[in-house]
């Protein structure tokens, strides 16, 4: 456990933001709440490259009170509100270099019934197939802003991770009129996972959900899609 977390922290400290985004696919994201532990596998993530990225909040080294966490150390949780939805990001570069990864979707695993309750009864792929949806499902709130994704109640659990068969790189969603930054393939997804939004139904891997065929990786997938535990 300690070894795996050290490796994860090292990735955040030494790799590019694009590499960290891809590394996070298959990573287990867990939130310990007062009513139990909720968690799942990250399947969709977008890289934001800071001062040069016209779609990034920190474009041009913009600094506001809301952006303070983006300038903190790797692994810092950056939360912001968009259209009433709270969005989860993680800082991926050294302090003072404001780059990060937005988590767009997870495949829910633990505490699914509570996630459904948190989402007012929504279930199946609609439970966590968007950035605001997964934050609501996991019960994430603004109190986590500025805390560490390695050691807070919301944390990465590398010893539980899975590995994608294939990673696809796509343009980010909802980035209009930003020149080349609109089309750059900075969104990374687990190809074939049903919790990926805006994909053809025929592209979904109904057997393995896009994961490599390793021990225990096929267990109990179908019941989650049906929204049952």
UniProtKB/Swiss-Prot annotation:
GO terms for molecular function: alkylbase DNA N-glycosylase activity; DNA binding. SUPFAM superfamilies: FMT C-terminal domain-like. The keyword DNA repair applies. GO terms for biological process: base-excision repair. InterPro entries: Formyl_transferase-like_C_sf (IPR011034), MPG (IPR003180), MPG_sf (IPR036995). Pfam families: Pur_DNA_glyco (PF02245). Keywords: DNA damage, DNA repair, Hydrolase. Its EC number is 3.2.2.-. The keyword Electron transport does not apply. Belongs to the DNA glycosylase MPG family. This is Putative 3-methyladenine DNA glycosylase. It comes from Enterococcus faecalis (strain ATCC 700802 / V583). The lineage of its organism: Bacteria, Bacillati, Bacillota, Bacilli, Lactobacillales.
